């Protein structure tokens, strides 16, 4: 299976001011978005997989492009949010079940519904408490309950340093038309 737009690229866009295709599984640097792990879990069933994707507050975005509805659920791996808020998230897995832990407290165990194609390898967790930050751990288990994979995201601390270096090639133009 191949999907032309699986990686973001410069060129075709969805109206100004967008300069490229961004409804993909990989960003321009080939860094995977959380949805890429859904594809990995489906096409590499022999390698146990679990990966957390936090639903962005902005939600989903879909576009009608060449008479095909495309788009993606805006997911990220960020666990820095407003204290006391709740977030929904997905775990992408090819394991039998996933247990979700927030700061060490179990949010429950859900089984991977492999009988329904639209739900296979995707487990949805609604209104997960953020609290005051900390960590979220997804533990994938086989049918016997043995751990086969694990993924963890955590709240980042305050930045300690930022370094910026100017990059000023002579052919760049600040006219709104340059891709840089």
Language-model region placement:
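Short, solvent-exposed loop/turn segments enriched in Ser/Thr/Gly
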Residues: 175-179
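Substrate-binding clefts and catalytic carboxylate motifs of secreted carbohydrate-active enzymes
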Residues: 1-173
């Amino acid at each position: 299976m191949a999907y032309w737009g699986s990686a973001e690229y410069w060129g075709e866009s969805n109206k100004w001011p967008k300069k490229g295709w961004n409804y993909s599984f990989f960003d321009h640097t080939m860094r995977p978005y959380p949805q890429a792990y859904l594809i990995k879990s489906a096409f590499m069933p022999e390698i146990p997989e679990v990966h957390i994707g936090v639903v962005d507050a902005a939600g989903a975005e879909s576009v009608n492009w060449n008479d095909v509805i495309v788009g993606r659920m805006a997911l990220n791996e960020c666990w820095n949010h407003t204290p006391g808020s709740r977030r929904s998230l997905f775990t992408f897995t090819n394991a039998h079940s996933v247990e979700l832990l927030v700061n060490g407290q179990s949010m429950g165990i859900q089984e991977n519904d492999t009988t329904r194609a639209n739900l296979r390898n995707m487990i949805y967790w609604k209104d997960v408490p953020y609290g005051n930050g900390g960590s979220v751990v997804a533990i994938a288990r086989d049918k016997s309950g043995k751990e086969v994979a694990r993924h963890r995201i955590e709240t980042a601390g305050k930045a300690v340093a930022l370094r910026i270096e100017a990059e000023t090639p002579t052919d760049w133009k600040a006219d709104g038309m340059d891709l840089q």
